[in-house]
């Protein structure tokens, strides 16, 4: 069904031939215009017959301007939302463009001046810090000089003056030994655990065990620190844990296993410690006891022993000799190790035992001069009167007044490599020094 053109007034417009439409898009030259006028065809208008929208203005680069405006407002504490009005109203922004540009320049100048002021303040603060640190360094230097002056006045030799050797820890030695003196009070075993805790063992059993461990440590060429730590672990464990006599040797080898792992470069294996007990204890038993000991001491193996203090005290004693006196070191170590087997020496602090060993060793080697001097008193922190009981008890061990038959320590220090210092005794008793 077809509709008439009268019913659709725009039908003629819709049914325009494609040729006419295409001709409207052909370029109009002068010759084509004459031909078209001759045929009665109207030339297409140069301007559109319908109303067009107003041409938009050319886009301008406003990104920097808007960013500078927002940044400056932010620095002033303004609101970004308020600045969006400037972006929505280009006419007003165009009118005030010059003013905003001037404001931006002013803000930039202000910010530069603020930055310069802040930089100057920072530099002044740094200069003050440098001057303060220099003042502190000078104050510390003055204190050190004052301290050295006091030591010279007291005739104390500075054994920490060798700052070139990093192993000496000269700068920290005093602080280190301050902490060690505190630690020996906190981690010492009970002096009467045989009476309070143990019921199946006695001091003689402990003496036999430790004398045997001295022999084991010498056979395996273990360092003295291993032996001292072994005895320390034994006493700490026995101070709070009951043990039967059948397991006392198991405790000893397990403690030496732990100490060897902690102190030695190459520790003996578990099988070695089982072997030295004639396989009385199996590997699982030794490992089980090792775990029990470590849990009991909470894995605190870094403890001050007599050997810890003995190194420093011997160094202080050697300061009075032009050439190091090797017999003094061997003899002091011998006297200190004699105390390991004696349960009664638990009542003395390790530092006191070390100081007494140096005192008695110096007296044994030379009776013409008093064994104590300001340097030893300064570094050991003990006066002569405080050493009396320990030195007298140690002299009894040296002379073996009790007739003890356990001689592992004596045989060890009778060897030529230790200058046979176990044979040395003093012709004069040390009691004469305390009666003055």
From Swiss-Prot:
Transmembrane segments: none
Expression (tissue specificity): Expressed in roots, stems, leaves, flowers and siliques.
The protein's name in its UniProt record: Cyclin-A2-2
Xref: CDD domains: CYCLIN_AtCycA-like_rpt2 (cd20506), CYCLIN_AtCycA_like_rpt1 (cd20562)
Pfam families, alphabetized: Cyclin_C, Cyclin_N
Keywords: Cell cycle, Cell division, Cyclin
Annotated family: Belongs to the cyclin family. Cyclin AB subfamily.
GO MF terms, alphabetically ordered: cyclin-dependent protein serine/threonine kinase regulator activity
Gene name, Swiss-Prot/TrEMBL: CYCA2-2
PROSITE patterns from the UniProt entry: CYCLINS
InterPro entries to which the protein is assigned, alphabetical: Cyclin, Cyclin-like_dom, Cyclin-like_sf, Cyclin_A/B-like, Cyclin_C-dom, Cyclin_N, Cyclins_cyclin-box
Organism whose genome encodes this protein: Arabidopsis thaliana (Mouse-ear cress)
SMART domains: CYCLIN, Cyclin_C
One GO term of the biological process aspect: mitotic cell cycle phase transition
């Amino acid at each position: 069904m077809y509709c008439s053109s009268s019913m659709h007034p725009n039908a003629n417009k819709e049914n325009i031939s494609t040729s006419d439409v295409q001709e409207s898009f052909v370029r109009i030259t002068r010759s084509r215009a004459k031909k078209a006028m001759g045929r009665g065809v109207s030339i297409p208008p140069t301007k559109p017959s319908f109303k067009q929208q107003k041409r938009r203005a050319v886009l301008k680069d406003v990104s920097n301007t808007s960013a500078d405006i927002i940044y400056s407002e932010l620095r002033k504490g303004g609101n970004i939302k308020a600045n969006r009005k400037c972006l929505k109203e280009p006419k007003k922004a165009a009118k005030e463009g010059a003013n905003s540009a001037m404001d931006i320049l002013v803000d930039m100048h202000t910010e530069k001046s603020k930055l310069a002021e802040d930089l100057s303040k920072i530099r002044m603060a740094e200069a003050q810090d440098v001057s303060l640190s220099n003042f502190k360094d000078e104050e510390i230097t003055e204190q050190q000089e004052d301290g050295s002056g006091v030591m010279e006045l007291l005739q104390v030799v500075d054994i920490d003056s060798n700052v070139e050797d990093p192993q000496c820890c000269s700068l920290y030695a005093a602080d280190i030994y301050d902490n060690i003196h505190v630690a020996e009070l906190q981690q010492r075993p009970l002096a009467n655990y045989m009476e309070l805790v143990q019921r199946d063992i006695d001091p003689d059993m402990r003496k036999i065990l430790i004398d045997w461990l001295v022999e084991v440590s010498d056979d395996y060429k273990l360092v003295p620190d291993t032996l001292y730590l072994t005895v320390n672990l034994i006493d700490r464990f026995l101070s709070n844990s009951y043990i039967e006599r059948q397991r006392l040797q198991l405790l000893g080898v397990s403690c030496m296993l732990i100490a060897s792992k902690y102190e030695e470069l190459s520790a003996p294996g578990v099988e070695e410690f089982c072997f030295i007990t004639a396989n009385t204890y199996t590997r699982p038993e030794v490992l089980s006891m090792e775990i029990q000991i470590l849990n009991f001491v909470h894995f605190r193996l870094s403890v001050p022993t007599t050997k810890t203090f003995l190194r420093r005290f011997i160094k202080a004693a050697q300061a009075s000799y032009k050439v190091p006196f090797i017999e003094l070191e061997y003899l002091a170590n011998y006297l200190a190790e004699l105390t390991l087997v004696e349960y009664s020496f638990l009542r003395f602090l390790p530092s006191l035992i070390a100081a007494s060993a140096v005192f008695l060793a110096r007296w044994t080697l030379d009776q013409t001069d008093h064994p104590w001097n300001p340097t030893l008193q300064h570094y050991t922190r003990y006066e002569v009167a405080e050493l009396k009981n320990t030195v007298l008890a140690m002299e009894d061990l040296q002379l073996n007044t009790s007739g003890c038959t356990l001689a592992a320590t004596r045989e060890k220090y009778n060897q030529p490599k230790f200058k046979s210092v176990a044979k040395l005794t003093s012709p004069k008793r040390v009691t004469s020094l305390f009666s003055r």
